UniProtKB/Swiss-Prot annotation:
Keyword check for ATP-binding: no
Short name of one Pfam family: Cytochrome_B
Binding residues for heme b b562: H82, H183
One Gene Ontology molecular-function label: ubiquinol-cytochrome-c reductase activity
Entries under SUPFAM superfamilies matching the protein: a domain/subunit of cytochrome bc1 complex (Ubiquinol-cytochrome c reductase) (SSF81648), Transmembrane di-heme cytochromes (SSF81342)
Protein name, UniProt field: Cytochrome b
Length: 386
């Protein structure tokens, strides 16, 4: 124990992971940090291993993935572990953000860790998109073509920017090479941002379900919360193993097992399931530029939450009206996810437009208005009591 506190490096780990004082009333909604760190670790290790056998060439990429699956020892397991952990990574991130929205973890003095977290989410989406292109199946090629083409909506520089990203006049070998390079690099940037997220969080400590300062009653991180984290970690391993060994392609798209063919467009071009809500927002705006702005705006609006929430009460635990609207947002997000997976036809177009309208209304109208109503009711109750 003495070495843990005196060694220059071990003392850092001790203050952040072992002796870190945490509120005594944290529930399982605070376990996602450890799960996300574990997912990122798995992704980096499996990703580096896969990169040793992958060839970023349009003639060899699909074959090299099949080589990994068939000839590399446990290559099938490493690839499926990488693909399915990515799905759980996003699931945990969405739950982590949902917990932050519900319990008001974005409010001062924790606006900085919240902002870093939103940047992490955006980079994660970019990394996932780049990785989806690498197997060079039908979804890879056409997904890359559709998504990169969105940048052509930017006035004046759009067309030149798209050709700069492609490295030519279409998605080709240069595109695959640079996508592979960036997909390899970004997880390490994500790891650095995750450390910054932890450093910023350590400044004021974790929030808690009550939304009040917890200085009066705290517990050490170890053994109390490390063992609590292990419960959800083992549960995660169990569910991940079920997908890995029994349904490894359940969350993927079968068209990506067809080699990329620029002469044949798939019946429907859809991204991975975890990007579908934002894909639905993109599709719901008829104008190309408007759709791109809406898609990026749906992510960047999270950065404005510390300014939009005017309530004096942190979180929704003691705010019945806000609690009701929070669960409406959850339902709306699931509707967007479902709409994004469907063909671009009625009633999914109209439903997606309604869901998109509600999504932005929740942040820009509902949150500030409900905050003002609740503050007014608190003032009236205080005056009547006095």
């Amino acid at each position: 124990m003495k070495l843990l506190k005196s060694h220059p490096f071990l003392s850092l780990a001790n203050s952040y992971v072992i002796d870190s004082p945490q509120p005594s009333n944290l529930n399982y909604a605070w376990n996602f940090g450890s799960l996300l760190a574990l997912c990122l670790g798995i992704q980096i290790v499996t990703g580096v291993t896969l990169a040793m056998h992958y060839t970023p060439n349009i003639d060899l990429a699909f074959i090299s993935v099949e080589h990994i699956m068939r000839d590399v020892n446990y290559g099938w397991m490493i690839r499926y572990l990488h693909a399915n952990t990515a799905s759980f990574f996003f699931l945990f991130v969405y739950l982590h953000i949902g917990r932050g929205l519900y319990y008001g973890s974005y409010k001062s003095p924790r606006a900085l860790p919240w902002s870093i977290g939103v940047i992490i989410l955006i980079l994660m989406m970019a990394t996932a998109f780049l990785g989806y292109v690498l197997p060079w199946g039908q979804m890879s090629l056409w997904g890359a073509t559709v998504i990169t083409n969105l940048l052509s909506a930017i006035p004046w520089i759009g067309k030149d920017l798209v050709e700069f990203i492609w490295g030519g006049f279409s998605v080709d070998n240069a595109t695959l090479n640079r996508f592979f390079s960036l997909h390899y690099l970004l997880p390490f940037i994500l790891a650095a941002l995750a450390v910054m997220h932890l450093l910023a969080l350590h400044e004021h400590g974790s929030s808690n379900p009550l939304g009040i300062t917890a200085n009066a009653d705290r517990l050490y991180m170890h053994p109390y919360y490390t063992f609590k984290d292990l419960v959800t970690i083992f549960l995660f391993f169990l569910v991940l193993a079920l997908f890995l060994f029994y349904a490894p392609n359940k969350l993927g798209h079968p068209d990506n097992y067809i080699p990329a063919n620029p002469m044949q467009t798939p019946a429907s071009i859809v991204p991975e399931w975890y990007l579908l809500p934002f894909y639905a927002i993109l599709r719901s705006i008829p104008d190309k530029l408007g759709g791109v702005i809406a898609m990026f705006g749906s992510l960047l609006i999270l950065l404005a939450m510390p300014l939009l929430d005017l309530s004096r009460v942190r979180g929704s635990a003691f705010r019945p009206l806000m609690k009701f609207f929070f669960w409406l947002l959850v339902v709306d997000f699931l509707i967007l996810l479902w709409c994004g997976s469907q063909h671009v036809e009625e009633p999914f177009i109209t439903l997606g437009q309604f869901a998109t309208t509600f999504y932005f209304s929740w942040f820009l109208i509902i949150v500030p208005v409900v905050s003002v109503i609740e503050n007014t009711l608190i003032d009236l109750a205080t005056e009547n009591k006095s």
